[in-house]
Amino acid sequence: GDALKSDKPVNMLGGGNPARIAEVNAVFADVFSKLAAEHAVENIGNYSNPQGDAALIDALTTFLNREYGWNLTADNIALTNGSQNAFFYLFNLFGGKFKVSDDLSVEKAILLPLAPEYIGYADVHVEGQHFVSVKPKIEAVEHEGEEGFFKYRVDFDALESLPELKEGKIGAICCSRPTNPTGNVLTDGEMARLDALAQEHGIPLII
């Protein structure tokens, strides 16, 4: 945004990568140069399959099956034009207005287990209440022996007693790991409890 155009130093926490590393940027630049020299230019005038690049889909299914022991096929993989596009589809698929009967409909929201969350989620809904969230527990912690640090933790007491969850008004649970812009990382234990909560209510957990 305009803040980045300032002549004063700015730590950009509103989006993108707040910790760009020169050495990593150099690696990316080298890879992009090689791609351009090989076959990227050839693809400029061509459209790929509507499902996405077949080679990438095959690579993803092979990787996920090998790493997690799954039995995926190309039919289980959906490629989108970046994460914003993916969340547009997901949030409007599981959130918004749902018709229960001819005379009855219900609005469902996306549950964010704690806030602050990724600012990019804010503008992807088409209709209905966008989000429901609860305040996190903030725990003072030490880092390498130094005080003055803190960590966000999910307040499961508040989360599990949320009226919208009990009333079936939550379409999905969504969390970022790590979270942008705070860098907070939900623990394995927190993820396991969120998974169990999602299964209990029959809704997806989107990470």
Regions of interest found by a model, annotated:
Residues G1-A55, T62, R66:
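N-terminal "arm"/small-domain region of PLP-dependent enzymes with the aminotransferase-like
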Residues E42-I206:
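Conserved core of the PLP fold type I
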